[in-house]
Amino acid sequence: MYAREYRSTRPHKAIFFHLSCLTLICSAQVYAKPDMRPLGPNIADKGSVFYHFSATSFDSVDGTRHYRVWTAVPNTTAPASGYPILYMLDGNAVMDRLDDELLKQLSEKTPPVIVAVGYQTNLPFDLNSRAYDYTPAAESRKTDLHSGRFSRKSGGSNNFRQLLETRIAPKVEQGLNIDRQRRGLWGHSYGGL
């Protein structure tokens, strides 16, 4: 009996070990500087066999942040319930890494509409804008300034969420058969807040 219990815990221990190693690696990368080299042409510029792309520009209500939003729609007929849709933050970096091989894999199942929400820059990240857009307001005041060497205004996530919900999503989804029960929002680092 003991041997059976031991064998059944071994996979769990292995999974725990691998997840622990992954956590250590990822935590070391938190302190790494992002690669801020200018981006070249992306999949929307090159074209895809599996998706067709469009891009739209938006400005923040206060006019200080400028967004580029790419929409990738599968080249297949929408399911009866509509396409699932995935909004992805850090859209410039997403578009730089998105390729036809991944789009092919997505199109083999129920392909989602992909919406990459980025900024009007040729860099992978607009560090100041994303620090503001992706962070919640401090309880003591509406916006805050991160202190330290790289001071950035923060606390604009409510404004950004309102932009996503009231301007970007309605414009992107206009004319598309979308399954509103299968919407997702993806982000990492600040974008995961």
Residue positions per predicted region:
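Active-site loop->helix "elbow" adjoining a glycine-rich segment at hydrolase catalytic centers
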Residues: F160, S189-G192
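Short, structurally constrained coil/turn elements
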Residues: G63-R65, E108, D179
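Bacterial N-terminal signal peptides
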Residues: H18-S27
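Serine-hydrolase catalytic machinery in alpha/beta-hydrolase-like enzymes
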Residues: G82-L163, R167, K171
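Alpha/beta-hydrolase fold nucleophile elbow
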Residues: N177-H188
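Surface-exposed acidic, glycine-flexible loop patches that form ligand/cofactor-binding
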Residues: P74-A80, K104-S107, Q174-I178
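N-terminal secretory signal peptides that target proteins for export/translocation
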Residues: M1-P11
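A domain-start/cap signature at the N-terminus of enzymes
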Residues: Y31-Y83
